[in-house]
């Protein structure tokens, strides 16, 4: 279980949200909504261990992730706005790089197949369209073999077919006792089975 307890985060000395609480059990799918600048990205970065909270804590299996990051990091994968790919490398070289880090080279073929990357596998990443770049970045979800997926606006720059593909992968991960947390501006019909957390409910200054 991933749990936030009385979580408050700030950016540039500005408090974004205060006393946020939720629990994500295995098989959870959670959508964090709110307008730009409301703190969605900061929350998901905090959940990933990249942004220590002002107060409160994030716990995974009962342990504070900031006290014990080495045991938490292998359990999760975070996909942010930046795709974390090298323009000078081909798609296959980027994926192989991630697989070496996670020691999951056996998952490369499956990731390429599931995300239908074969047409661009030998093309340099910097030559791809925005949609293909995002799709390649999302291959890290499968390469990581992680229980927790944290994705900032996963459907950005994707066409409807690719969005459906990603939704199917999210559902499969959830059904396999995974936890999936994503951000978006609002809920949609396709995300109706996600639990929604509106970050604006916690946009209050610390006192």
Residue spans for each PLM region:
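Catalytic Walker B motif of ABC-type/P-loop ATPase nucleotide-binding domains
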Residues: 149-153
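Q-loop/switch helix immediately C-terminal to the Walker
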Residues: 82, 87-103
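Conserved ABC ATPase "signature" region
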Residues: 105-121
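Hydrophobic anchor residue at the start of the ABC signature
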Residues: 138, 177
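Conserved ABC ATPase signature
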Residues: 97, 124-133
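Conserved ABC transporter NBD signature motif
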Residues: 53-67, 71-72
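Helix-to-loop junction immediately C-terminal to a conserved catalytic motif
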Residues: 48
């Amino acid at each position: 279980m991933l749990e936030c307890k009385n979580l408050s985060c700030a950016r540039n000395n500005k408090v974004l949200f205060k006393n946020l609480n939720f629990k994500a059990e295995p098989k959870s799918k959670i959508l964090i909504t709110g307008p730009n600048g409301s703190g969605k990205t900061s929350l998901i970065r905090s959940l990933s261990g990249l942004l220590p909270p002002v107060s409160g804590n994030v716990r995974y299996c009962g342990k504070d992730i900031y006290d014990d990051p080495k045991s938490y990091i292998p359990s999760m994968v975070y996909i942010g706005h930046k795709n974390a790919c090298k323009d000078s490398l081909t798609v296959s070289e980027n994926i192989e790089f991630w697989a070496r880090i996670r020691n999951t080279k056996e998952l490369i073929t499956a990731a390429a197949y599931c995300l239908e990357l074969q047409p661009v596998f030998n093309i340099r990443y910097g030559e791809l369209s925005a949609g293909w770049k995002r799709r390649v970045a999302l291959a890290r979800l499968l390469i990581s073999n992680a229980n927790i997926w944290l994705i900032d606006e996963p459907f950005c720059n994707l066409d409807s077919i690719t969005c459906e593909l990603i939704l199917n992968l999210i559902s499969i991960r959830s059904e396999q006792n995974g936890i999936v947390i994503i951000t978006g501006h609002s809920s949609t019909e396709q995300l109706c089975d996600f639990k929604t957390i509106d970050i604006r409910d916690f946009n209050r200054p610390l006192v």
